[in-house]
């Protein structure tokens, strides 16, 4: 819900509206945008597999983990893109990406959070596209688009997240405030992919 509120708040401030129902992830150049789209496709694949196997108990934790990463990693790292004045291509891509993620996520969560999904759908999709289906529950369930899954990028981002989390733990242990700059921070990586991530 926080991600949805963030998008709606800043979209209203900038008077931004989605231009088309057909988003093009292949046009994205920002690594954060490409990562969240890849992660969303991985989530879509996992949710479909788990639901097909009637393992609904595995669906909600995967969704919660995704939402946590969306709000606490993607949006926090992208905030300055939304805050800057003017509407350059990077800012527009940030809006388009977050809108697309929330649009697909709304459909993914509909079976397990029907009322939240419906509220988000009514405000996101129907406001922008009045000819869309009148309810999220009348839309096709999302299917994975494998070509947008980038496992290497997801692994790199996971490593960076882990490094940041461990850095916060060390800051806490040493009583160093988050906003205080560090003179240096050493990350040890034993694999080439993780070395490239840093």
Regions found by a protein language model. Give the residues of each.
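Short, hydrophobic/amphipathic alpha-helical patches that form generic packing surfaces
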Residues: 2-9, 104-107, 166-169
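Acidic, turn-prone loop/beta-hairpin segments
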Residues: 14-45, 76-166, 184, 188-191
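Short helix-adjacent coil turns
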Residues: 51-58
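Aromatic-lined ligand-binding clefts that engage carbohydrates, nucleic acids, or primary amines
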Residues: 60, 64
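Extended, charged helical/alpha-beta scaffold domains that provide interaction surfaces
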Residues: 168, 172-198
């Amino acid at each position: 819900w926080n991600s949805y509120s963030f998008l709606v708040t800043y979209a209203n401030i900038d008077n931004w509206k989605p231009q088309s129902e057909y988003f093009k992830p292949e046009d994205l150049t920002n690594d954060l945008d490409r990562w969240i789209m890849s992660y969303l496709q991985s989530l879509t694949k996992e949710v479909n597999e788990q639901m097909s196997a009637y393992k609904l108990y595995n669906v909600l934790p995967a969704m919660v983990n995704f939402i946590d990463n969306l709000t606490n990693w993607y949006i926090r790292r992208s905030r300055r893109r939304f805050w800057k004045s003017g509407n350059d291509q990077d800012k527009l891509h940030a809006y388009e990406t977050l809108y697309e993620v929330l649009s697909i996520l709304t459909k993914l969560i509909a079976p397990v959070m029907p009322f939240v999904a419906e509220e988000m759908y009514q405000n996101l999709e129907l406001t922008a596209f009045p000819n869309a289906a009148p309810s999220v529950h009348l839309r096709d369930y999302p299917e994975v688009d494998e070509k947008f899954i980038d496992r290497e990028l997801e692994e790199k981002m996971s490593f960076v997240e882990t490094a940041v989390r461990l850095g916060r733990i060390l800051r806490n242990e040493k009583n160093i405030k988050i906003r205080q700059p560090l003179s240096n921070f050493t990350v040890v990586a034993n694999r080439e992919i993780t070395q490239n991530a840093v």
